[in-house]
């Protein structure tokens, strides 16, 4: 079971959906920055852009690492933080190609569809 996290820039909210591994299989080979049709995730009319993710073992995806697996690389800054001058660190990161071992995939909405993502909530007090 994999999770996609969809960020909505207009409202500032994020939405989480659980998807099957066969849907991740359809996305295999896509890269960070690719646009995907929302019909993969029961969101017709929406266009989504892949912005990142993480593998089953927790390693984050790195945009400028063009491989499908994980790799230990030597970098001058840690992923997501600014480092100190002169210090290099060896870290394990996952490449930017989506594979079957993805557990979380982060996306943003680039084109909106006819139906809103947020479902109206029922009030408990009134019947």
From Swiss-Prot:
GO CC, one annotated term: ribosome
Keywords: Ribonucleoprotein, Ribosomal protein
Keyword Ribonucleoprotein: yes
GO MF assignments: structural constituent of ribosome
Pfam families, A to Z: Ribosomal_S6e
One GO term of the biological process aspect: translation
Disulfide bonds: none
Name of protein: Small ribosomal subunit protein eS6
Native source species: Picrophilus torridus (strain ATCC 700027 / DSM 9790 / JCM 10055 / NBRC 100828 / KAW 2/3)
Gene: rps6e
């Amino acid at each position: 079971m994999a999770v996609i996290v969809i960020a909505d820039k207009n409202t500032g909210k994020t939405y989480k959906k659980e998807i099957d591994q066969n849907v991740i299989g359809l996305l295999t080979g896509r890269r960070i920055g690719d646009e995907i049709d929302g019909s993969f995730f029961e969101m017709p009319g929406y266009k989504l852009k892949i912005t990142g993710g993480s593998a089953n073992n927790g390693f984050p995806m790195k945009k400028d690492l063009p491989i499908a697996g994980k790799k230990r690389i030597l970098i001058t800054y840690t992923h997501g933080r600014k480092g100190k001058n002169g210090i290099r660190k060896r870290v394990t990161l996952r490449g930017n190609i989506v594979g079957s071992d993805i557990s979380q995939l982060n996306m943003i909405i680039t084109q909106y569809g006819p139906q809103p993502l947020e479902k109206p909530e029922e009030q408990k007090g009134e019947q």
